[in-house]
């Protein structure tokens, strides 16, 4: 891994008063989602859990992790964790979402392919959560990408 991207996105469905928040890490090399966390609250624990899942291997030294300027990514404990792993933090310019275009693009694909137009079909947050888990598996292991020469993200890495 050389450059990875992260952010948090929100899902709301009519069947629930609560929302679901997805916090993934996307590998810039092959667009694979290498870790993610789903939570009903966009809190620091969600981001910490996602980071611990993403950066347990030895392949992260000299990695740059890019995010927007969300409060989670400005927190001291976030920066301490990255420093402890030898990961360099990078942040978008304030109010400039194109700086985090790879992550925003993934969110757009995810929501257009499995969420927008289907919101009413999810009867619970658990059902939505499972649909997101299934989609990320599909995205990493079955969905071909033209920019990866017609391969899926997992194949392209090997």
Please place each PLM-identified region on the residue numbering:
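Mobile-element integrase/transposase regions
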Residues: 1-24, 48-49, 60-62
